[in-house]
A protein has these predicted regions:
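Signature of extracytoplasmic/envelope-associated structural regions
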Residues: 1-136
């Protein structure tokens, strides 16, 4: 299987392509481990997978221009926004899946940085519902 180096990831938030203003993306999916151990089970605990608890973490390069980062994210605070993440900006396919989901925009840091540094904003938003993976 081929290795991949992320150099051209594609990320949209609320229908706006912000790929050129994002330095890092992490889409994480986990499942609760629900214990099912019953009386008579003496060797070990048993479990089944429960509800998904997914999240997306993005590191933005802040941009206050019209149609860019701040203008896109600020109005979404407190709402559920459509997000699309692909490893590469090219056509969706078996080697470039598209992950589509709604994220609850629970946090935003519009101003962050020190003297002489790039203004950035790192966020982690919970996924609101399921993640859909498309390969065609």
């Amino acid at each position: 299987m081929a290795k991949i180096v992320l150099t051209n990831a594609y990320i949209t938030v609320g229908g706006v392509d912000l790929s050129d203003s994002i330095a890092s993306v992490s889409l994480s999916t986990t499942r609760d481990a629900v214990e099912t151990t019953a009386f008579g089970s003496t060797a070990a605990r048993t479990r089944v997978a429960g509800l998904a608890d997914n999240s997306v973490t993005l590191e933005f390069h802040q941009d206050f221009a019209s149609g860019e980062v701040e203008a896109t994210i600020y109005p979404l605070i407190g709402t559920s926004a459509a997000v699309v993440v692909k490893p590469n900006g090219s056509v969706t396919g078996a080697t470039n899946p598209s992950y589509t989901f709604n994220a609850l925009v629970t946090e935003w840091t519009p101003v962050n940085g020190a003297v002489g540094e790039l203004a950035t904003a790192s966020i982690t938003w919970p996924v609101d519902g399921a993640i859909t993976k498309a390969v065609i």
